[in-house]
Amino acid sequence: MVRLTPRLVAIFLVEKTTSGANFVFHWPLQPQVRLQATHHNNDSAESAIGMLDLDDSDDDENNRFTEVADDTHVLGYEKGFLANMLSPRIELCNQKFEIWVDGLTFLGCPVHIGPNGEWAKRRKPRTTVESNASSSHLVSKPESSHPSTGSFEVKSSSSKSRSSMSLFHVVFVLNVPTATVYRPTVNTMYDHIVVKLVTGLKYEQAKRNYVENECIHILKLTEKYSSQNVPFDVYAAQIPHHSNLASVLATTYEALINMHTAYLEINQSINLSLLWPMSVSTNTLENYELQVRPSTILASQTIFSEEHPSSIEPFVAPYWTLLLLKDTDTIMKRVPLLQNSLLSSFIAIVKPNLTFTDIANRLGISVSECFILAKHLIHWRKAIAIPPLLIRNTYVTSPTANLFNLEEESKLFKKEFPSLPSLSTFLAILSFKPRPFASIIPSKDHELVYLEMLAWLCRRNWVYEQNIYMYILVPEEIKKKAIALIESDESSKNDMQLRKQLEQDNGKESIIIDPHSASLLEQKWIQIIAYERGPEMAPLFTSIVKYLNGRFALQTIWVAEGLPRKLMRNILNEYNDYILRWHSW
């Protein structure tokens, strides 16, 4: 799985007025571009090329070049040329703008003033947007993928000062060298960053002429310092301190390249948060995210929708739960909440041993509403979706645990759980032969504190649940029975496809990789195995066959099928000779 990162080189601000196009501002002062060298490595190496090199401890200058930016040039281009190129005609405005030049992608959504001289379409509103809270909601949840079709009404600035600016364009310059990640990266940047930012700027321009005034202010500052022969790097670094719009763009850039949330205040009117969505799960240990952020879970099991797989959209199922990454009080302070709101009630009631179904029942809401609240917290990296933490499950020391932090983490652990043994002691216990977590709990009175301790260890990436995955094992005797059955049945005997599959099989013991898409011969094997333990057990076995593909954890199968845990255990015991089990995270 390739990790998507912004691959952001710079952010430009361009405007077009009655006197022509102007290159107004860019950040950073000296953009750097990663050279797109030719690589002959395997796929995993190629995937790494498409990542922002946050994990490069040694900054290889040979792999970077920097075209010195000054008053008139940036990235080796004349700013006047860029201003004209990035100021398209009106037919291409108010929609996605994407140009690829010399390995760089220029992405944005140019906003053009309407034929009537208005920046926003007027619609009859139910309520007029005036307050900060409404503005924030407006920006964070645009109704379409293009800012041009927003349904908000604004009171335009005075008609006496009709805008001389006809277009403004915030351009995100990307460097995405590999084709495999190009389209997902560009689409993610546009949908999650560009649209939301431009919607907010368009709103303020329509309401208060904000963007035009800021452009005038920035250009005046630039002209003033330039005429005084102040070095470009000196005066350009000061512009964000004197311009709110420049500060917004600089903050956005710095947050994105560091994978942080950009908390923006546009014109002291709109509070907007921008966040690059991250993958919520990985099935490989070679994933850098596991070391830098706890909101990625390590999972071999299928945790995404089979119909709509996604590495970004979190999978939530009724039998899963939510693990908060901070304590409840901390999240309550950081997430803007209305007192007694549904989200605050949801956060207060969430426990890692309660399934989403349990939480929904306690709140008196539907499971789908519960999912919406959970996905909101997951998106903002306040929580992760996991199978419920249960003492009868097996937990082991995480293969990605950062032992360099053990001393510091041990102090935090002791402060959090003063009555328990040390963190090192628990990690040592969990590193031995895997066993149910309940076996290390001294008494029933200790269950609650041990569950809290387990949640603490999970959210800090010290332990993972050890899961059991299964395949159907087909012994030679089953294959012999299948041959006899086929030979005795006239229709099967004359089935050319079945005969061909039979000829290709060597008759030795094998496994069925995916029962859901089993061949005709494999279906025969499954049918014979099912009835090996009698007609009463056969339907029970066939009900779980689709999960025996090595991707679904045993701990979730019985919940997904609504089978009692004891019955599930009986099924597996009965068919033990025909099931291959393996343990993983």
UniProtKB/Swiss-Prot annotation:
GO terms for biological process: cellular response to amino acid starvation; negative regulation of TORC1 signaling; positive regulation of autophagy. Residues 128-138 have a biased composition (Polar residues). It holds the Pfam family NPR3. GO terms for cellular component: cytosol; GATOR1 complex; vacuolar membrane. Residues 117-157 are annotated as: Disordered. Residues 148-157 have a biased composition (Low complexity). Belongs to the NPR3 family. This is Nitrogen permease regulator 3-like protein. It comes from Schizosaccharomyces pombe (strain 972 / ATCC 24843).
